[in-house]
A protein has these predicted regions:
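Short, positively charged, Gly/Tyr-enriched micro-motifs
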Residues: 1-42, 171
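A short, flexible helix-boundary coil/loop motif
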Residues: 2-4, 206, 212-219, 292-389
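Active-site-proximal, Lys/Arg-enriched surface segment
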Residues: 26-111
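Electropositive, glycine- and tryptophan-enriched low-complexity nucleic-acid-binding patches
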Residues: 88-153
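Domain-level cores of phosphate- or acyl-group-handling catalytic modules
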Residues: 128-189
Length: 389
């Protein structure tokens, strides 16, 4: 656009005077410590608090639910560095080198959107004998995240990998609570206790009738407080256990969900606690899956670099997703546009086409133009929205 008309959308929309070539950007990003982006994420969170966006995510009146999960964002069979993790194919012997990160996300059972937080990269260090892992990276993230300490208490959500004594101890050490998936196959001692309680009919239970897709289902909640996670006397954790069994009218079991938590479970709150635990799936569906398949292409190899390029490209990608989320939660014009266009990909494609053809007066004018063009049967006058030569 700059070459054709002497104007460009980077200048009119975002105030960028000089646009560097992509290789120059990569060279700059490669040298920047990834932790430098943390302050940007925190500034956005601070604005979310001022705008009361965070209020939508308050759970059980005083908590914020944060789901933890790991995801890959770069892989190659040739390009590698000292920070790469690796996995050897047992059949072919071929080594795959990859980068991954913990992508913490604020979630809420009643809110469609999620708020992405600053990542913790799973990264091998020089001299390290064992590869870094998801749990260790999650512990580091807990050590470094203290944004809500004064106002809200966090409830950490995680899959069965997290419901172990070391992780629970770290969560409690940082002053947080937890609702973690707890599978029978990996918690033998805990479930032996549960079976004893069930056999003696000493557990609490409540069944609620609900409608799902026009069909009646029964949600049965079972819970027991004050169990030991493992059999050890020293390295142990006291937990409260709950499960949800969903059955249909014929009594067929459709789904079972089970969790451990440090929150005291009662007949009045068991449904809400289980609902909070189940919200963990939003980190996979609304966060990681969106980043990979809905237009952000997180797993695409945008570049590896010699130092920090791949980490920083990952962080910037998630930052873009965060900005779009905040717009969707607060900006009425953007909300209307998303509702009108549906999938994010549709919006990205429309923007890509329009910005390659026209220089808009500003970002809002582009949004208005897309909306009016879709809603009006008459031709929209371009002069009201773009800069003319």
């Amino acid at each position: 656009m700059q070459t054709k008309s002497g104007k460009n959308n980077a200048k009119t929309m975002f105030g960028i005077d000089n646009i560097p070539v992509d290789n120059h950007v990569r060279n700059i990003l490669d040298k920047i410590d990834p932790k430098s982006f943390k302050k940007i994420y925190e500034d956005i969170l601070e604005e979310c608090q001022k705008l009361k966006i965070i209020n939508q995510f308050v759970f059980m009146k005083k908590y914020i639910l944060v789901a933890l999960d790991g995801t890959h964002y770069h892989s190659s069979k040739k390009v590698k560095c000292s920070c790469c993790q690796s996995k050897t194919d047992s059949r072919t012997g071929i080594i795959n080198y990859f980068h991954s990160a913990i992508t913490p996300t604020i979630v809420h059972p009643k809110v469609k959107n999620v708020i992405a937080l600053f990542q913790e990269f799973i990264s091998n260090k020089d001299g390290q004998k064992k590869q870094d892992c998801e749990v260790n990276a999650s512990k580091r993230w807990l050590d470094n995240f203290n944004f809500f300490n004064q106002k809200y208490k966090l409830i950490i959500l995680g899959d069965d990998l997290y419901s172990r004594v070391p992780m629970i101890s770290k969560i409690k050490e940082k002053g947080h609570s937890f609702i973690l998936v707890c599978k029978e196959t990996s918690h033998k001692i805990l479930y032996e206790q549960i079976e004893r309680f069930k056999s003696a009919n000493s557990h609490k239970t409540v069944t609620i009738e609900k409608m799902h897709n026009g069909k009646k289902q029964f949600f049965t909640y079972n819970f027991i407080n004050g169990l030991l996670l493992t059999g050890g006397n020293i390295d142990n954790a006291e937990v409260n256990w709950c499960e949800l069994i969903i059955t249909n009218l014929e009594g067929k079991k459709l789904h079972t969900f089970s969790f451990v938590t440090d929150l005291k479970i009662t007949l009045n709150n068991v449904e809400e606690i289980v609902e909070g635990g189940r919200t963990r799936w939003k980190i996979e569906n609304e966060n990681n899956n969106t980043l990979k398949t809905k237009g952000y292409n997180l797993e695409h190899n945008f570049g590896h670099g010699k130092q920090y390029l791949s980490q920083n490209l990952c962080s910037l990608n998630i930052l873009a997703f965060l900005f779009h989320t905040i717009q969707e939660l607060y900006d009425t014009l953007y909300m209307e546009l998303r509702s009108n266009l549906g999938a994010r990909k549709n919006l990205f494609e429309a923007m890509n086409i329009l910005t390659s053809m026209f220089t808009f007066i500003n970002f809002d004018k582009m949004i208005e133009f897309i909306l009016i063009s879709r809603e009006s049967d008459e031709q929209v006058p371009l002069k009201d929205f773009i800069l003319l030569n």
